[in-house]
């Protein structure tokens, strides 16, 4: 992803002199959160009957919720210089750290697989060929590991400085071209869906698609400044999670297209006059760069929990990702993407929310700053940190139950499942952690008194 893993150990804070500039980090994050599938989901939302005003309002609201999480998560990485797995050791204990790492790995593999499928789909749609989706998805799943395997920075740099700006310019040009063609009355038409349904579906996608969960893995390379983190995040979300899906909705409104395959081909003809190779080139760079970043984070989790050679870890992750892509290739890619975003907005951020809560409690209430310079080895950790594990599982349960994906519990599909999961985990962890801290404080206060009483009893004995 353009940041060499040899720069520093995963469990050692990144030195300040090795931190990247705001421009580099900003371009990196924009590349990671502005992707073409966000345009395709706009077609799906139009098909489901959501109005323009609903899409606009719910997308912006979802971005605000996401920023409330992502800025503290990224700032924690920048202040500590540590990544996701290093920070998790401070909070979750030995087995909890393994659980958190495994959680990140399986979700990353799922994302890796769907982007390989989307790349295969782009080839078929733009070149108007009918190659086997399964075979192509497997091939791309393996090829997308090339950059991480050999440690080249050129592909990621090309994606940041060329492909991402071209993709943004492509969608931006389409947005301004289309919005002038849509009758103003269409922008204010009433919706066929309740506002709460629109909020649940739209905001969950925005959060699930743009959240990474392991933001500290990337922002540990940034200088600790809230403004330097917030500005690129706001820009990235405005482009990738507001303008991109609205563009898809506008085109669907204008053309009546609802199928993602047809939509990709139409966008290429609409913007590049049918030069398919240009659109394919831009999408390939974007998808390859995204999976490059996904592998970077999942490799960090795998290597810090189960030590192995870097290339061995990449081979394992790429092969599992390719198999996952093969499984996804036989299903509707947009529906699969929607399911993944619903799961992602729950399972990826909840552990980080707990880490943020611990950091906040230590800074504001306990007055016990974390020693980021010394990350304990796994063997030095307690087996289980119960407050963190209970809060983690509670967040997972609440988010999953309210996501609407469990048969028989559709009636509980209300609100934004991710926000409910985050608030649950933060609240439960705060209550349990404060209780634990008070018990520890009382215990430490009693030690001198107990020692004094024991000494007196010894002296009194004949």
Each model region followed by its residue ranges:
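Membrane-water interface regions at transmembrane-helix termini and the short interhelical loops
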Residues: 46-49, 74-75, 118-128, 140-162, ...
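Hydrophobic, membrane-embedded alpha-helices of multi-pass small-molecule transporters
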Residues: 20-39, 174-180, 188-251, 272-292, ...
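Hydrophobic transmembrane alpha-helices that form the core helical bundles
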Residues: 97-129, 284-304
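Juxtamembrane transmembrane-helix boundary signature
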Residues: 59-92, 99-107, 429-441
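Transmembrane alpha-helical segments of multi-pass small-molecule transport proteins
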Residues: 101-105, 126-150, 164-175, 197-213, ...
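Membrane-interface loop-to-helix entry segments
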Residues: 120, 135, 139-177, 189-192, ...
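C-terminal membrane-solvent junction of multi-pass transporters and transport-like membrane proteins
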Residues: 352-428, 442-450
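Membrane-interface "cap" regions at the ends of multi-pass membrane proteins
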Residues: 1-52, 195-202, 213, 219-227, ...
């Amino acid at each position: 992803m353009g940041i060499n893993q040899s720069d520093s150990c995963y469990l050692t804070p990144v030195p300040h002199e090795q931190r990247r500039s705001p421009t580099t980090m900003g371009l990196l994050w924009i590349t990671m959160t502005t992707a073409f599938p966000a345009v395709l989901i706009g077609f799906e939302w139009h098909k489901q009957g959501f109005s323009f005003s609903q899409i606009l309002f719910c997308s912006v609201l979802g971005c605000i919720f996401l920023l409330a999480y992502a800025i503290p998560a990224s700032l924690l990485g920048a202040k500590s210089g540590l990544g996701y797995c290093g920070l998790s050791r401070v909070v979750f204990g030995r087995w909890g750290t393994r659980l958190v790492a495994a959680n990140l790995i399986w979700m990353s593999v799922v994302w890796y697989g769907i982007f390989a499928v989307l790349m295969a789909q782009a080839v078929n749609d733009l070149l108007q060929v009918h190659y086997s989706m399964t075979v192509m998805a497997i091939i791309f799943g393996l090829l997308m590991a090339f950059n991480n395997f050999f440690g080249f920075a050129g592909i990621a740099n090309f994606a940041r400085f060329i492909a991402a700006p071209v993709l943004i310019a492509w969608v931006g040009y389409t947005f301004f071209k289309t919005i002038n063609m849509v009758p103003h009355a269409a922008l204010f038409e009433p919706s066929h869906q309740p506002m709460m349904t629109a909020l649940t579906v739209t905001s969950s996608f925005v959060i699930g698609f743009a959240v990474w969960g392991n933001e500290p893995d990337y922002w540990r390379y940034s200088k600790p400044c809230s403004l330097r983190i917030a500005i690129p995040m706001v820009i990235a979300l405005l482009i990738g999670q507001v303008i991109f899906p609205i563009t898809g909705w506008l085109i669907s409104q204008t053309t009546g297209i609802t199928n993602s395959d047809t939509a990709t081909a139409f966008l290429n003809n609409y913007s590049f006059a049918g030069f398919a190779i240009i659109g394919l080139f831009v999408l390939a760079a974007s998808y390859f760069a995204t999976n490059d970043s996904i592998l970077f984070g999942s490799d960090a989790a795998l290597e810090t929990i189960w030590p192995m050679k870097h290339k061995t870890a990449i081979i394992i992750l790429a092969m599992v990702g390719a198999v996952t892509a093969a499984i996804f290739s036989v299903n509707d890619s947009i529906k699969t993407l929607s399911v993944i975003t619903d799961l992602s907005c729950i399972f990826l951020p909840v552990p980080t929310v707990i880490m943020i809560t611990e950091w906040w409690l230590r800074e504001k209430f306990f007055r016990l700053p974390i020693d980021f310079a010394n990350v304990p080895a796994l063997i030095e950790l307690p087996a289980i940190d119960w407050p963190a594990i209970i809060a983690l599982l509670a967040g997972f349960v609440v988010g999953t139950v309210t996501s609407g994906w469990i048969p028989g519990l559709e009636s509980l599909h209300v609100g934004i499942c991710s926000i409910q999961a985050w608030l649950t985990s933060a609240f439960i962890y705060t209550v349990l952690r404060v209780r634990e801290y008070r018990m520890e404080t009382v215990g430490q206060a009693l030690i001198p008194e107990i020692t004094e009483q024991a000494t007196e009893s010894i002296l009194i004995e004949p």
